A protein has these predicted regions:
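Accessory nucleic acid-recognition modules appended to NTPase machines
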Residues: 1-126
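Conserved nucleotide-binding/hydrolysis micro-motifs of P-loop NTPases
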Residues: 59, 135, 166-168
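Arginine/glycine-rich "motif VI" loop of SF2 helicases in the C-terminal RecA-like domain
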Residues: 95-97, 122, 147-155
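Short beta-strand-loop-alpha-helix junction that forms the active-site gateway
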Residues: 131-139
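Short beta-strand/turn micro-motifs composed of small residues
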Residues: 132, 162-163
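Residues at alpha-helix caps and immediate loop-helix transition turns in enzyme cores, especially N-
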Residues: 140-144
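Domain-level recognition of nuclease-like catalytic cores that cleave nucleotide substrates
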Residues: 164-193
């Protein structure tokens, strides 16, 4: 989710100016990256807060003092680490992609809808990505992507629920479940063999 600056300030016991200086330093050192909130006038009540990511999941684990075993044992932490990992992969691929998509996130103000990552292409087309710490996500894991598809119509060119399992399969119209490994390889379609 998106953490408001006020929550970070209060938790760290620092003022806004100090937090801003630390944030600039960490960004300049390429330790964190801020991903902007996606916005369109076609949707109402979208949160405009940037989402912060630690650039490297290995550094994230070291700072938190956690091991792979402890990450796997805590579902929320695993989800956040996987989300960070996927964003890092997409950031690298988007930088060298001919299409040069913008990377965003989406969350409505009341929190009813949240999509981990949005790719926006030059013509305004949008591709949504949900990251799940599950080996076999179901249609309920695509509910926010379906909502966005229904809101945007043809501007929504597709969506994927990335997961930890090995299979590629359809979830809904223009939405599939695919293994995270498909970020760097072609997933095997069980229908093809």
């Amino acid at each position: 989710g998106v953490v408001a600056d006020s929550a970070i300030l209060e938790s760290a016991g620092i003022n806004r100016e100090t937090a801003s200086s630390y944030g600039r330093l960490l960004t300049n050192l390429f330790a964190i990256e801020e991903v902007p909130a996606w916005w369109t006038n076609r949707l109402k009540r979208l949160v405009q807060l940037r989402k912060r990511y630690v650039v490297d999941t290995g550094v994230l684990a070291a700072v938190l003092g956690v091991t792979a075993r402890s990450i796997r044992a805590h579902g929320d932490l695993l989800g956040r680490v996987l989300d960070t990992f996927v964003m890092a992969q997409l950031r690298a691929e988007a930088a060298v992609s001919e299409a040069q998509p913008g990377l965003f996130h989406l969350r409505t103000q009341e929190g009813r809808h949240e999509i981990d990552i949005l790719l926006e292409f030059g013509g305004g087309e949008v591709f949504g990505i949900e990251v799940k710490a599950s080996g076999a996500p179901g249609r309920r894991d695509a509910v926010h992507l379906e909502w966005l598809r229904d809101q945007l119509g043809s501007a929504f060119i597709g969506g994927v629920v990335l997961h930890t399992g090995p299979r590629l399969y359809p979830l809904a119209d223009r939405i599939v479940a695919a293994p995270m490994s498909s970020l760097w390889s072609t997933p095997r379609d069980p229908a093809v063999g």
